[in-house]
Amino acid sequence: MNNGILHQNYNSKKFDIIKISLASPEVIRSWSHGEVKKPETINYRTFKPERDGLFCAKIFGPIKDYECLCGKYKRLKHRGVVCERCGVEVEQAKVRRERMGHIDLVCPVVHIWYLKSLPSRIGLFLDMPLKNVEKVLYFESYIVTDPGMTPLEKKQLLTDDEYAEALENYGYEFEASMGAEAIRDLLADTDLETEIESLQAEYEESKSTAKKEKAIKRLRLLETFQASGNKPEWMVMTVLPVLPPDLRPLVPIEGGRFATSDLNDLYRRVINRNNRLKKLLDLNAPDIIVRNEKRMLQEAVDALLDNGRRGRAVTGSNKRPLKSLADMIKGKQGRFRQNLLGKRVDYSGRSVITVGPSLRLHECGLPKKMALELFKPFVYSKLRLGGYATTIKQAKRMVELEEAVVWDILEVVINEHPVLLNRAPTLHRLGIQAFEPKLIEGKAIQLHPLVCAAFNADFDGDQMAVHVPLTVESQLEARVLMMSTNNILSPASGQPIITPTQDIVLGLYYITREKEGARGEGKLFSNYDDVSRAYNSGTIDIHAKIKLRIDRQVFDTKGNTYNEKGVVNTTVGRALLLNILPEGLSFSLLNKVLVKKEISKIINQAFRVLGGKATVVLADKLMYAGFKYSTLSGVSVGVDDMTIPENKEAKVEEAEKEIKHITEQYQSSLITENERYNNIINIWSKTSDEVGASMMDAISKDTVMVNGENKEIESFNSVYMMAKSGARGSYNQMRQLAGMRGLMAKPDGTMIETAITANFREGLSVLQYFTSTHGARKGLADTALKTANAGYLTRRLVDVAQDLVVIEEDCGTDDGLMFSAIVEDGEVKVPLVERALGRTLAADVVTEKGVVLLEAGTLLDENLVEILDDNGIDMIKVRSPITCKTRRGLCAKCYGRDLARERKVNVGESVGVIAAQSIGEPGTQLTMRTFHTGGAASLGITVSDIKVKTAGKIKFKNIRTVTNKDGQNIVISRAGEIIVSDTMGRVREQHKIPMGAVVPLASGKGVEIGDVIATWDPHAQPLITDVAGKVVLEDVIDGITSKHTYDDLTGQQTIEITSISQRTTSKNLKPVVKVVDEKGNEIKSISLAVGAVLNVTDDSVLEVGDVVAKIPLEGSKNKDITGGLPRVAELFEARRPKDAAILSPCDGMVRLGNRDTKEKQRIEILDKSGHIAEEILLPKSRHLVVFDGEQVSKGDVLADGPTDPHDLLKYKGLEAFADYILIEAQSVYRMQGVVINDKHIETIVRQMLRKATILDEGDSKFVKDESIELVRILEENDRLAKEGKRLVEYELTLMGITRSSLSTESFLSAASFQETTRVLTEASIHSQVDQLRGLKENVLIGRLIPTGTGLAVRKESNKIEKMREELGVEDNMIFTEASSFNTEDTLFENQIEKEDKDINDDIEESLRNALESLDF
């Protein structure tokens, strides 16, 4: 008996896949334990369930354990007996959570999901519009199901009158009916095979794309039904399953009333209507009444399944829509997200956090009361083992009375038992870390100050939760993987996240500053102890400059050791810190003024050279010192610390005078409104900066007497020190405190032109205060929106990347991405060394002389990237997650180094989730606004030349030049760049050169710092001719396509091309400048864009390099740039921008002006033989950047606009696309000063490229133009290659993260993300199988996730499975009695034991490796 139970429970957990499909009536009946016939629930007097009702004990099982309803059979001994009086089986009461019932519907009912979830599956299957299907279903029209010999058509709709007429004319030769029966008959009658064949023929023959698309959609649906084993008529239900009663409870509340689940109401409506319909049919009621009742039954079932999907939602007594079955599973409060993906856990507590400055990094302070509650079971068992209590009850009593011995035992229990601390919101994995608890009095949890940055915690009332890992394994994982001391580096950037902030920084800054003429200056000390004694006795000042003899051992990153010896100039404070500095680090790290950045460097260096353990100790010591000396320094802020500059009033008056002058100019109509506004904003910006500068001058210098003369030294002003050290505050805030507040922004981002001239020390007037509130309120509103948006972005990212895990060491590819330094505005923002660190080389690194420096497959560490730098390598090929060939995962080599652990990434690391967290976590720091360029935001001066900042050589890239009559070299190419390399050949600068720029030097020439390498007109883009000849103007007609103006002063005529939208007639005219030779043959034609101002007239003579026309740049620059969070979301969602740039689909020559239509212009691209290879239609308002007859390559820009990532991938290839996303996303984060490693963005990009489009199906089952998972195509190609058949050809398709998440192979993961109804409908028709590969699916069904230690466990269990199969052992043999084992089983048991030992050894080994790498 017992084994049966075990077996039953064991099996319920053991499955490999989950399949979802349509349920047939037979299947529904097989689930059921009886039919629910009555709408009654329970008897309100006896509280017993009614028989055959919704809570019937006979159908669903007993209410009390092992007790039938009437009480005849009680106790376990009667288990399994069915009571003959009440018909209830004697069982556990929990079967009421599992047993289902059913309702036999009198007439069929359509399942609303397959009707209304778009696209309507029933409509598509029957090839009928949804409206028509609804008319039939809700009894408005008849539908012909069998036309017989009549001229009626199958599926033709008939109104009542038409039906009556047809009956009169044809009698009963045809069949027509209405309601779900009709639909069911039509579905059942469809012959799938013949229908599929006719559709395939239609698809082949059809010429129109719309028809083809419709045919292919229908074809796919029919093929799905054919393949999945689902019958189409199952979309119409004849039997309705009833949920087990304990999942829709009815609970008595005081006052004799009941609280009930909405589902019971919905079921009661269905049963009532079903029973009424049965009665009406028995009575042979009139057709119209029956019809109405059938319609109501359909509506009742609709409401039960998905309330509100059709028509108005059914409401309860309180006017609230009832919660249907569909509502139970979808949304944040649904089953998936509320109960399966996020559960509440036992053994946890929460409390306010407070600062624990005396803790060590791996400790936290846990209030005694809390600890006792959390560790109760451990305390109970220790009390029994120690002999203090004989029973658990006694132990419990002792704990409740809080006897003295309990506290002693609690100390023992919590010793070295780590607890997890978590602060919500947990934006990245460092939001949960493990600490060793220390018992403290009070009720607040004490947190170590250095981990605040990781938790983003402060002590203004934040709360944190504590969780206790119970099992030994979980304690081990907490200690090895989650301990705060093992999480020194941030997984997002690889930089230390444990760096001192605020008070600590201030203290260290204060004691490392020097003061002229301080007490004890110039003394020489022989060691640290002498300095310490002298300082403690008060003979020397902490800021005094002294000399100190040192003798230390120093290690470098390459592992070499050298001695640091001799006398150094230092200060007393720095000498005192020498005691903290561990052996191996140079004193020069400390021997300077320690601002925040420098302290970070020390910790970084310590980690690189000495490893984790020493770094943790150093960080703690730095913290103690920082706190100690910031206390001793007595730094505080007073009103007098804010020094207002003396020249402030004069500056403000001067600005007001200038503004008055500008206003007068505006009133005399000499300048425009826009110029007036911009000038005023400029003046106030400048004034504000000048006042700020004078304030900084005043506040940053002090005058002291040294040897009787005045000397200027750096100030010890408190506010200045706080800002300078990086502890708190910034220059901007100081300016507002003591300078002037300056310009304020309106909520839309534009500046208010009346600046605030007061500062906070003087105080603001009412008007100025009001002006300030504008921006401040916007800030608060923004923050609230931003948090939600950033959270949603993180959720989408996690969802798309959750199943990406490192599953093998090496995929063996030699593909990769080309990496070079990132250059913005000509400056190197991110050097190659930083980008290459921690990546694997995909190709050998070779010098110009052909020497192989580093071989492919090398993992670049700090020492190896220096080799790149030393040899002036400016481009390398590295392996990338995007190009990794591993299927359903990644390989360790393509991913490279694990940023948080500084070694190669482990197999089993869930890199997808880490990537998503790294990108999403800083989301709240990004701005929400779009930047308005033009106006106040772009106060930068317009750039019109390029001066080099590095001495070296210049090199042209994609630059074509012509020499004009003045001997100048004019650039005539569009996307040209000049690269500046230093003397070593390393790329130091990279500048984009606009068309029309003059370049004085040739490629390959040497340059010095400050040399000008290009100049151009910043206000206009010139159109330049590269041929000489005579001008013929075509379609340049005054008043129609152009505007001719004469300047009376100079007598010159200007011709400006007007916009098409301003023309009333002649919309097909295209203004062109043609250059002809002496015989009048055309050599070149230059099309003129809107706004172009001509420099030539008819019959002008042109030389090579002359300017034909200029396009003013004002109009094109004043666009909004989407910045911050919306930009990142836009990139990852792969949205197509409005008016995107048009790229050339192939190589060839451009031909314009041929067969243009009224509204559109046509670009034709001719191949080498002169045939049209591709043609593109564009609105005439779009500005083309190519000329007639120009040669273009695939992917060249034809019409400018923002980049469309889809086109970039299609025409320029994977690498160009990857580059674009990386650079764009990184520039947003860089603006906010956030460092994220490239590989995280690449990891997400990989997930956006999971699908591919079939170009040629080969010998596969796929259909051309179908979009399919890349993995499936590759697997199919492997199969075809084995059989020697034609392979599938495909191209990668780009999908945004939301679409990518919804189209994953796992329907569980997709359904728990968004659009649950749609996903489940789709999956059930396909009879989809979920292989449970990802993390989310396994969390949903409550298993270990297949990553980290879970992956090891899964691999081992798969091994055991395999052995089971080989030995032919069934599962239940494990549960048979030992005596009945045969030899084979015993052999198997031994094998299992050995395997178990192996598993333990494996896990032990992986943990040992982890421990070793962590330096314990």
Curated annotation (Swiss-Prot):
GO biological process: DNA-templated transcription
Cofactor list: Mg(2+); Zn(2+)
Residues annotated to bind Mg(2+): D458, D460, D462
Known EC number: 2.7.7.6
Binding of Zn(2+) 2, residues: C811, C884, C891, C894
UniProt xrefs under Pfam families: RNA_pol_Rpb1_1 (PF04997), RNA_pol_Rpb1_2 (PF00623), RNA_pol_Rpb1_3 (PF04983), RNA_pol_Rpb1_4 (PF05000), RNA_pol_Rpb1_5 (PF04998)
Alphabetized Gene3D superfamilies for the sequence: 1.10.132.30, 1.10.150.390, 1.10.1790.20, 1.10.40.90, 2.40.40.20, 2.40.50.100, RNA polymerase II, clamp domain (4.10.860.120), RNA polymerase Rpb1, domain 3 (1.10.274.100)
Record note on cofactor: Binds 1 Mg(2+) ion per subunit.
The keyword Transmembrane belongs to this UniProt entry's keyword annotation: no
Catalytically driven reaction(s): RNA(n) + a ribonucleoside 5'-triphosphate = RNA(n+1) + diphosphate
GO cellular component, one term: DNA-directed RNA polymerase complex
Keyword flag Transferase: yes
Binding site residues for Zn(2+) 1: C68, C70, C83, C86
Highest rank taxon of the organism: Bacteria
Family, similarity comment: Belongs to the RNA polymerase beta' chain family.
Function: DNA-dependent RNA polymerase catalyzes the transcription of DNA into RNA using the four ribonucleoside triphosphates as substrates.
Designated name of the protein: DNA-directed RNA polymerase subunit beta'
